[in-house]
């Protein structure tokens, strides 16, 4: 099935809970029974969302290996001239899922039917917990419109467990103080979710998850322990990373790991940027239709009816 479309239904396996820490390997790449094995390496696909170019790594597929996440998009990098029209995704609904946005450079403007209106800056993290349903609009930030510059970031969706899918929606922007930065001789990292090497994010999620942005220095050798019952995947932004079984991860590629072992072993000769994510898979069925991610087809139909009847808000008002 194409990664351009969400699947209509898929079971996800369950798992237990643990927080990882980091160890530094004493040599280069090596194999070990304790290292996670590779399930698959995928090339992200180029698409357009509104007027924004993206690279899509997955969208509703491979859930047995990426849950609790359901979508991974890299947007940009795109250089914007001062005074140019904003890169924009017009008002659209969500339900049963938490779209999150993180900017490596530039800024974004989020406006929604909950009366939130945010400018999200570089290094900040936004969570749009859509719950039973809400509408939002996204575009490049005001500073980029006024001064020009580069926009580059990631929109990654977290699936919402069944117990919380019909909660009231809410939007939150998290500043630097919520996400610790790690600086050492091997890498510079941001702990957006979860815990790494004793540094812990204060951001709460419905189910245990980790989300690390890592800038690897030259000849960085890392062995990152994770819960062997949790999913894990890694996306390469720039540079290249040597991983298990003599494979090399290149820009716009994502590696999905198997469960059963905990350690993620990697090495970068010339340096690299990667996102490493994962967490406890949900033991629940998934029915999805575009921006709606629910547990039954009946719930999907209710989402469509709620949107069409205006219960999620007025898209014309959000677009203003």
Question: In which residue ranges do the predicted regions lie?
Answer:
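Extended, compositionally biased flexible segments
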Residues: 77-144, 148
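Ligand-binding loop in jelly-roll beta-barrel domains
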Residues: 131-164, 259-288
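C-terminal segment of N-terminal export signals and the immediately downstream linker at the start
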Residues: 1, 21-42, 320
């Amino acid at each position: 099935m194409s990664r351009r479309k969400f699947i209509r239904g898929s079971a996800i396996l369950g798992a237990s809970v643990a927080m990882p820490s980091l160890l530094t390997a004493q040599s280069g790449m090596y194999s070990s029974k304790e290292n996670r094995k590779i399930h698959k390496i995928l090339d992200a696909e180029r698409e357009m969302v509104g007027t924004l170019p993206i690279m899509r790594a997955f969208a509703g597929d491979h859930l047995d290996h990426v849950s609790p996440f359901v979508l991974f998009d890299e947007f940009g990098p795109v250089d914007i001239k001062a005074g140019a029209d904003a890169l924009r995704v017009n008002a659209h609904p969500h339900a049963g899922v938490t779209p999150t946005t993180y900017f490596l450079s530039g800024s974004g403007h989020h406006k929604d039917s909950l009366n939130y209106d945010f400018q999200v800056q570089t290094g900040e993290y936004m969570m749009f917990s859509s719950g039973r349903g809400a509408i939002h609009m996204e575009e490049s930030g005001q500073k980029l419109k006024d001064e020009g510059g580069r926009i580059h970031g990631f929109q990654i969706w977290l699936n919402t467990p069944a117990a919380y899918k019909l909660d009231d929606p809410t939007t939150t922007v998290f500043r630097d103080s919520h996400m610790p930065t790690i600086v050492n001789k091997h890498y510079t990292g941001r702990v957006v979710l979860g815990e790494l090497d004793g540094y812990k994010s204060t951001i709460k999620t419905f189910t245990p998850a980790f989300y690390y942005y890592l800038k690897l220095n030259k000849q960085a050798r890392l062995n990152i322990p994770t819960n062997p019952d949790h999913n894990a995947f890694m996306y390469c932004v720039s540079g290249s990373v040597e991983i298990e079984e003599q494979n090399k991860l290149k820009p716009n590629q994502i590696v999905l790991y198997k469960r059963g072992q905990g350690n993620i072993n990697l090495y970068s000769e010339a340096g690299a940027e990667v996102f490493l994510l994962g967490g406890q898979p949900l033991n629940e069925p998934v029915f999805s239709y575009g921006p709606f991610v629910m547990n039954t087809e009946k719930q999907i139909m209710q989402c469509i009816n709620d949107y069409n009847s205006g219960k999620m808000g007025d898209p014309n008002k959000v677009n203003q």
